[in-house]
Every structure is written in structure tokens, then in C-alpha cells.
Amino acid sequence: MKKFILVLLKIILILILTFIGFVAYITITDYRPDDIEIMEVSGPQAEVFELQQDTLNLLAWNIGYAGLGAEMDFFYDKGKQVRPTKKMSRKYLNNISKFIGEQDSVDFILLQEIDEKARRSHHANEVQEIRELMNNSYSVFAKNYHCQFIPVPVYEPMGYVRGGMLTISDFPISKAERHAYPLIASWPNKLFLLDRCFILTRFPLANGKDLVILNTHNSAYVTDKNLRIKELKIITNKMKEEFSKGNYVVAGGDWNANPPGYEPADNYNGHKFFKSEVQMDLNSIPEGWIWAYDNKAPTNRQNYKSFVKGENPTTILDYFVVSPNIELIKAEVIDLNFQDSDHNPIYVKIRLRNN
């Protein structure tokens, strides 16, 4: 009996030490970006020149790391699956790449949830693949998720992940920055969550001002209104600061909230609508700024089950905001029926006034 107790105590001690060692390792290797970081621009060698054209096309798309296509549900959204098969993930990525490669008329592409290396996407370097596809373009990648091991769900842990956001431009980028959002959780939870951010890219214009494009991916799964307000102020203060200098400002991406007063069109392209838990406050930006979205089709679907059109609740979380010195010509959701991502792309056409 005494021997059994000693063995049991040794096992318990080993488990405790293993757990402490794991937490210590994750803490030591935790990704800790600065509030503002200068980012490297990838692309062909070229001198930065003044942007002459005043009419521009942009597209934003959360590609769901090529892991959340129509066949998938997701454990974190009350589904059961953690990752697709390697074959399925490759199919999603091929289709996503094909779509992006076909956007010849689009000047700027803002992607969210794109992996450099992660178990959830079978270690495919999605950033490199997209960059090679768009080899005549300029791009900036910023990490917002880097963890050595995510231990959930316990029956099939997500494991290693290194992913983030990618801004792609047809024009040379004069400067690029990563701006960190505040952490939404305390230790130890923060060790396993995204380090949210937005990417700022700058382009000089012929009139002496800059076009400033912000690629954002705001927090999900946050019910504390004060945390969301704090996060939103980071980007809106930057937007207002740039506009006060006479610059042209475009912010787009996955805001994880409905735009102010959003109501879907009657048909909604055959989709079932749900109102998101979080609604963007109309007063979060000054009067004169434009919320650029499309109410004819959704950009996001719920992942508690595989996608069936008309059954899964859908909504819009992806859109643009443009400054008062920009005319919005068109905003359109490109309805891909969530075949390769749990988000649809949003496209806008704009015109810079007095450039």
C-alpha cells in the first residue's frame, strides 16, 4: 500500500511539473509585438512613385486559413471539427488562390487569417503561395497569431500556429506599419489567443498627400463592451489623425461586428440572416465618413454545422470605411457561397476627390 501511494505521488508530481514546464515554455516563447512596428515590404525592386490615378478598386477577404470551407464546422463555434483533411485544405487553398489570381482589376487586396505555418492548415505556407501567385505585386505580412502549441480541444489539439494578415498592392508601398490592438485577456489565457492588429500601408499621391490603407481584423468572442470600444479607438483615432493631415483613408477587413443599422435585403441571395451580437456604433467615426458595405448578400456564416445555403445563419462582418474626401462608387459582396472559407469577399470601388 505504501509503495502504491509513493508511485501515485510520483505520477502526480510528474504531471504537475510537466504542466508547469509547459506553461513556462509557452510564456517564454509568447509572441510580444510592440505597439507599432515597421514592416518589411515584399515585391519587385521599384522606386516609390506618386499615385496618379484617382479611381481605385479594393477587395477584403478573411480566407479562414483555407480551413473553413463549406464541408467544415468548427469546435470553437459549437461544432465538432478542428481541421479539414490535407486534401480538403489543399482544395480550399487552390480555389482561394485561383480567385485572388483572377482579380486583375483590383488594385489592393486585404486578406485576414492567412497562415505561414500551422498544424490547422497542414503546414502550408499560404503567404508564400499567394505572394508567388502575385509576383508582380507588393505585399506586407503581419503576424497576429503565433503560439507554439494550442492545447484545445484536448481530444485533438490545434497545436502550432503562425498566421496573420496580408496586404497586397499593385503599387509600390512607401511605408508599412503593424499597429497592435490591446490584449483582450490576461495571463495565462492571452498566451493562446490572437495578438490582434491592423496593417497600415502608405502611398504618396500627386497632390502631395497620402493614400493610407488599413487592413484590420478585430476581436471576436468578446462580450465586454469596454474592451471592444478600447480596441476600436486604436484604429479610429489613427484614421482621424491621418484625415486631419489631408490624407485619404480607407480601412477594411473583418470587423467582427455588423455595420451601424445594418439590415439585409429581402432576398439576401437565398441566405438566412442573423444579427451579430455586436453592432458597430454609428458615432465611432465622425459624420461624413462612409460605411461601405452591401446588404444584398452576407460575408460570414455560422460554423456550428457544415454549410447548407438557407440553413446556416449568415451576416455581414466584413466591410470598408472611407474618409470624407473619398467618393464611394460601389460596394459589393462577392457571394462565393462559403465554398472555401467561412467568409465572402467584399469589393469596393472608390474615387479620390481632388487628387
Predicted features, each with a name:
Residues 2-162, 354-355:
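N-terminal, active-site-proximal structural segment of metallo-dependent hydrolase catalytic domains
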Residues 36, 146-210:
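A well-ordered secondary-structure block
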Residues 57-63, 92-123, 168, 201-203, ...:
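Active-site beta-strand/loop signature of hydrolases that rely on acidic residues for catalysis
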Residues 65-66, 115-118, 144-148, 173-174, ...:
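Solvent-exposed loop/turn segments at secondary-structure junctions
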Residues 80-86, 114-116, 182-190, 217-226:
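Surface-exposed cleft-lining segments at the edges of enzyme active sites
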Residues 132-135, 160-176, 204, 311-327, ...:
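Conserved beta strand-loop-helix elements of the APE1-like EEP
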Residues 188-190, 306-311, 335-339:
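Short proline/glycine-enriched turn/loop segments at secondary-structure junctions
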Residues 222-223, 227-324:
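Metal-dependent phosphoesterases centered on the DNase I-like endonuclease/exonuclease/phosphatase
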